[in-house]
Structure formats: C-alpha cells, structure tokens
C-alpha cells in the first residue's frame, strides 16, 4: 500500500502541474514532452542497473496493449483537464482503480478479502468527493460537460493500462517492465503526434513551457516507478486503490498555491479516504 500512496504523490503532482502547463502550451505538447522525458529517464535507469531487456520479446502482446491504453489515457486525460470542468473530470478519473481491480480479480485470480474490498470502495468514494465541489457539479449538470467524455475514456485507459503495467512488472521486474511500458507508450504518442502535426506546428512551446512539461514527466515517472515496485510483489488491486488517491494531492496543491478553499463535501471525502486506507492497512 505504501508504494501505491507514493505513486499517488507523483501522479497527483503531475496532475496539478500538467493541468497548468497544458493550458499554456496545449495538452498534446505537454504529454509528448513529459512522456518523452520519462522514456529517456527510464532508459537511463535500465542502463545503470544493467538489467537484461531480452525477456521483453516474450511479452510483446501485453506491451502493445499497455502502450495503446496508456497512451490513449494520457492524451484524453490532459485533454479532459484542459476542457474541464475539474469538478467533473477529477472524480470520474479517480474511478480508473475500479477498472484495474476488476481486471486483477478476473485475470490474475486475486481475491481481496471483504475488509480490503470495503476499504477500496470507501477510498474511491472518498476520492471522488474530495476532488469535486458538489454545488458546482449540480449547477453544471444541465448539459454535457465538455471534458466528461474525455474523462471517461481516460479512466478506462488508465485502469487497463495500469493493469498491464502491473502485469509487465510481475513478469519482467519493475525496472524492465517500467522501461518497456514507457518506450512502447512513447511510440503511441509518436503516432498521435504525427496525426496532429499541423496543430502541433501551429503552437510550438516556448523554452519555459518545455521545462515545465519535463517537470510534469519527472513527477509522473516517480508515480510509475512506485506503482511498478508495489505491483511486482504485492496485490495489484490494493496498490491500484491506494494510488487512486492522487486527486487529493492535486486538491492540496490547489489549496496551497492557488488559494482555493475546500468545500464541506471535500472534508467528508478526506475523512472517507482516511477510513478506507485504514481498512486497507488492516486487511
């Protein structure tokens, strides 16, 4: 569970700063630069550890699926953050853990106990409450929020992609599994970038924007490393649920740096998250 919480710290920081950077240089440039840096850094880690990458060839199917779903998830997630509203996008995105848990139970044969399942459900509900303002949500339900379809797509993509990242980590070790997934994912971004080359060329990022996007990639990589380490030997379902608290980090940064004030339902959400994590720790 500790690794899942560390993953949440990295992903929550990347989420907050990714939203800020995405509105300056565009969501696609943000994700391409951030994940390009992550792939380079992951390669440096493999070179440093001297782990063999030959076993990757036996898992090309899982690697391809991880790349497709993860690349789709990142692109749609940053697009959802760019379009907003965050009050809708964030709680929907937090449900990715439920997708991954179902896959872990179905295909890995995991059988979390009643206490773990209860703790996971309470945690996810708490995250959804913490990451939104119910008053704004009710006020904005008269029409389809522009970011909602993108948020749903990203939740499914992250759930499936997270499952396959865990699968790769278990079979290849966290270093090679993490490296293979980052590089394969980058190939997916290259395809998207080529398809959108005209819009990318019309909005070239400045040096400051590139540096900020690299920072987003570094934070995201911290999350990926922690998640990979946790799922290599622990229950994938538990690590997934623990990592799903990442919106709390983004909310905390919004309070600290943007002066936002939490609303009552967010306090309730924090309490539920704490309760859910305690139940997971006792499971």
Each predicted region: which residue ranges?
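Alpha-helical transmembrane segments of compact multi-pass small-molecule transporters, enriched
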Residues: 37-42, 92-106, 184-188, 223-226, ...
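Juxtamembrane helix-start motifs in multi-pass secondary transporters
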Residues: 30-31, 89, 177, 239
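Hydrophobic alpha-helical transmembrane segments in multi-pass integral membrane proteins
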Residues: 42-52, 100-116, 156-172, 218-236, ...
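Hydrophobic residues within alpha-helical transmembrane segments
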Residues: 2, 6, 33-37, 61-68, ...
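Membrane-interface interhelical linkers
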Residues: 1-10, 17-18, 23-28, 33-64, ...
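Structural signature of hydrophobic alpha-helical transmembrane segments
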Residues: 1-11, 54-70, 111-125, 173-187, ...
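Juxtamembrane helix-loop boundary signature in multi-pass membrane transporters
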Residues: 1-5, 98-156, 265, 270-283
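Membrane-embedded alpha-helical core segments of multi-pass
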Residues: 10, 14, 41, 69-76, ...
